[in-house]
Amino acid sequence: MTFLPQEFIRKVRDRAPLDTADVARFVQGVTAGDVTEGQIAAFAMAVYFNELPLSARIALTLAQRDSGDVLDWRGARLNGPVVDKHSTGGVGDLTSLVIGPMVAACGGYVPMISGRGLGHTGGTLDKLEAIPGYDVAPSVDMLRRVVRDAGLAIVGQTAQLAPADKRIYAVRDVTATVESISLITASILSKKLAAGVGALAMDVKVGSGAFMPSAEQSAELARSIVDVGNGAGMRTAATLTDMNQALAPCAGNAIEVRCAIDFLTGAARPARLEAVSFALAAQMLTMGGLAADAHDARRRLRAALESGAAAERFARMVAALGGPADLVERPERHLPRAAAAAPVAAARAGWIERIDARALGLAVVGLGGGRAKIGDTLDYSVGLSALAELGERVEAGQPLATVHARDADSAAQAADAVRRAYRIGAEPPAQTRVVHAVIE
């Protein structure tokens, strides 16, 4: 019987029962070009309003995985599990740059397929492109070699991995259907499955700087990812973490790379960044069978940091992908620095009771460190550092942050935006946890 995309779309629109084989046929048509952009848009909008049942979400994820190459690590002679993490994104979220090396130093193999920033959120690929020579788009063969030799490779989605997802996402991006939980789930997990990942630790952000607008929707997304990931044969757990302020006390591409290097070498380990990094990395070790429990995992991760093994793995990955061999030892020699730096003075004394993390991310975009639209050229040197935290006591005139900009005018504009993002009150706010919940 001939498969008609419009009939499949009608079933999704009308919430009729879906045959998983039809889901696969639709995705095959997307890949082959037999399904038009208009039909993809109609499908995406139908899913946005109705969502998909679990069986169809799993089928969509597997079909998108199978639309291109699927990496099989069994022939690579790896002596450990293939594991990964993924974040829904936020501000100052540089966990990928530290978790990957930590887990690799503990015996895991991490082929991390990452993305670029859009809107207020920073992208891991953008951070890595601040490193001179670093190749974020190696061939599949190079990806295999780097993962085998360094234990990790943080790169972008290649044309061969989940191409159907790439086409569907391009349509979602211009049809106001990005926020569909079913489509987000399939997009994230199809790429992880295509990369041959056996276990995934998912970081779902909650708060003013989160991708999802409410805590309830963040929890719903986490549940969907866990159920679909496990249903598709990849051990998956999700952690809900706080994004009511920047995770690290900085935001901006080169600035965050420097922060990651400081974390790995022990020069500075901000408490919130450490809490989330250890929670996710410990999940990866326990799910991958590299640790007996969370306590054992944390002990191993701490040893990987203190011995320098994690920093060495990061350095090995950077060099293997074309970056400077001495980046960890001499980051100031290689990472770009902005021409102007200016402190952001607090307008009044008091306690920091609220931070609009999204506004901080948009301030970085305004400086040129993020994209207002796809295709924008980035200034990797700009951003924010020394960000004051929620609950901190400040005096009038005390710096809330330092702005790094290409010139004094843009620094002044960003400083105004940062100042408005902070609300200072007379009483200290209630303390909040950085790790809210774990969903398994």
Curated annotation (Swiss-Prot):
Gene Ontology cellular-component terms for this entry are: cytosol
Give the domain of life.
Answer: Bacteria
PROSITE patterns, alphabetically? THYMID_PHOSPHORYLASE
The alphabetical list of record keywords is:
Glycosyltransferase, Transferase
Family annotation (HAMAP family) = Thymid_phosp
NCBIfam families hit by this protein = PRK05820.1, T_phosphoryl, Y_phosphoryl
What name goes with this protein? Thymidine phosphorylase
Q: Which organism is it from?
A: Burkholderia pseudomallei (strain 668)
